[in-house]
């Protein structure tokens, strides 16, 4: 089982992740993780903090000479802005200064609910941990999961599908081509005309103190059939992936395959017909079985079916507005405008990178459940045996 915990506040000294269950023998270098961290910091519409933070990971345990050891992995991402917050965010009681307390909750954020739940009078005690800054270290965890999956021909990528109501379409091309094309775009978008309109909307929103959300699409290729299970509710792969995506800050909805469109079509236009070709032998394509459509998004009955896994996640607009909405001061109980924290106008491109990361972790977890071993060698032996078996079915 692959599991992890993260710790750290947005303006604390660092973000930390501890990963348990990574097998021995996975090639992993800091630069591999740093590439993913750099992708997260890109994107049209990001705020001034991205000019301060140049995220770099430190691997403190679990790796020796460029390979995982099977012991817990500890990954650390420093917050470069910490020096400016070392007093406000100090763990020492002598630095307490309640005159700087944040008392005006932002609509759409964790501020109010967290304050009521935990009894905090200073909303900074909530907003620091609930901030999307935490996703930096989750991207680092996802990079480690991607490194494992690559050893077995499984790749995770994606595109920005929508920003502010502008919908992008992809060219009729391979996923690899689409990912490479999206990587050249400041919005991770393959549709040039849509990208220009998205950028215009982001500029308009920034000028008016507003924010924009959108939709990201994560695609996983090379996945063998049989990950997940139908036998219990909490083992269903689509349920687990949906939970992983919904755990990302500001994500409010998830679709698998064509998702909600299935509710609008008759069954004959939804379900993917099954064909067999004995010449097809790859486990990632279901052995000899294949489909000519993929409305299911690669998952049926809670299990992968050998087709590409397609997931979409809807991100709401960031709740920190430079033209703030109405709120109530929790100290005086008087109506006020909500507090303003440094933030982005549009973080949809960053959300795509985070979405890829959490999906990679869950796919890796399901893969290890199915083919698990203490080392890459053991897992490869188990995986190859499975591939040979399904070729005969």
UniProtKB/Swiss-Prot annotation:
Cofactor binding note: Reduced FMN (FMNH(2)).
Gene3D superfamilies listed in its UniProt record: Chorismate synthase AroC
UniProt-listed SUPFAM superfamilies: Chorismate synthase, AroC
Record's catalysed reaction(s): 5-O-(1-carboxyvinyl)-3-phosphoshikimate = chorismate + phosphate
Cofactor: FMNH2
GO molecular function terms listed in the Swiss-Prot or TrEMBL record: chorismate synthase activity; FMN binding
InterPro entries: Chorismate_synth, Chorismate_synth_AroC_sf, Chorismate_synthase_CS
Enzyme's top EC category: lyase
Pathway assigned in UniProt: Metabolic intermediate biosynthesis; chorismate biosynthesis; chorismate from D-erythrose 4-phosphate and phosphoenolpyruvate: step 7/7
Keywords of this entry: Amino-acid biosynthesis, Aromatic amino acid biosynthesis, FAD, Flavoprotein, FMN, Lyase, NADP
Coiled-coil zones: none
Keyword Heme: no
Gene Ontology, cellular component aspect: cytosol
Lineage: superkingdom: Bacteria
GO BP field: amino acid biosynthetic process; aromatic amino acid family biosynthetic process; chorismate biosynthetic process
Binding site for FMN: 129-131, 249-250, 301, 316-320, 342
EC number assigned by the record: 4.2.3.5
Binding site for NADP(+): 40, 46
Assembly and binders: Homotetramer.
Family label: Belongs to the chorismate synthase family.
Described function: This reaction introduces a second double bond into the aromatic ring system.
Name this protein carries in UniProt: Chorismate synthase
Native species: Pelobacter propionicus (strain DSM 2379 / NBRC 103807 / OttBd1)
Gene that this sequence comes from: aroC
């Amino acid at each position: 089982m692959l599991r992890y915990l993260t710790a750290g506040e947005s303006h604390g000294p660092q973000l930390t992740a501890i990963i348990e269950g990574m097998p021995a023998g996975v090639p992993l270098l800091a630069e591999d993780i740093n590439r993913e961290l750099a992708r997260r910091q890109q994107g049209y519409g990001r705020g001034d903090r991205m000019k301060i933070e140049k995220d770099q990971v430190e691997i403190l345990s679990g790796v020796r000479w460029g390979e995982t050891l099977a012991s817990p992995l500890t990954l650390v991402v420093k917050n470069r802005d910490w020096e400016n917050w070392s007093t406000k965010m100090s763990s020492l009681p002598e630095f307490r200064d309640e005159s700087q307390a944040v008392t005006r909750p932002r609509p759409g954020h964790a501020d109010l609910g967290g304050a009521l739940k935990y009894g905090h009078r200073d909303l900074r005690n909530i907003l620091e941990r609930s901030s999307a800054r935490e996703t930096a270290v989750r991207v680092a965890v996802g990079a480690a999961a991607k490194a494992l999956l690559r050893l077995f021909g499984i790749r995770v990528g994606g595109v920005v599908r929508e920003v502010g109501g502008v919908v992008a379409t992809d060219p009729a091309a391979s996923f690899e081509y689409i990912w490479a094309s999206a990587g050249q775009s400041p919005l991770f978008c393959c549709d040039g005309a849509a990208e220009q309109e998205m950028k215009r909307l982001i500029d308009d929103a920034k000028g008016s103190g507003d924010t924009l959300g959108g939709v990201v699409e994560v695609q996983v290729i090379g996945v063998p059939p049989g990950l997940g299970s139908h036998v219990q509710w909490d083992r269903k792969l689509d349920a687990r992936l949906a939970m992983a995506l919904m755990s990302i800050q500001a994500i409010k909805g998830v679709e698998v395959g064509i998702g909600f469109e299935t509710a609008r079509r008759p069954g004959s236009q939804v379900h993917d017909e099954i064909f067999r070709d004995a010449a097809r032998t790859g486990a990632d394509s279901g052995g000899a079985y294949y489909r000519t459509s993929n409305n299911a998004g690669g998952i049926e009955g809670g299990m992968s079916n050998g087709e590409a896994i397609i997931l979409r996640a809807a991100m709401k607009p960031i709740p920190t507005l430079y033209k703030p909405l109405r709120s109530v001061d929790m100290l005086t109980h008087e109506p006020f405008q909500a507090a303003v924290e440094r933030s982005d106008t549009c973080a949809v491109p960053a959300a795509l990178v985070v979405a890829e990361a959490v999906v990679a972790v869950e796919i890796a977890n399901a893969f290890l459940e199915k083919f698990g071993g203490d080392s890459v060698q053991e897992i490869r032996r188990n995986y190859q045996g499975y591939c040979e078996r399904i070729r005969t079915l």
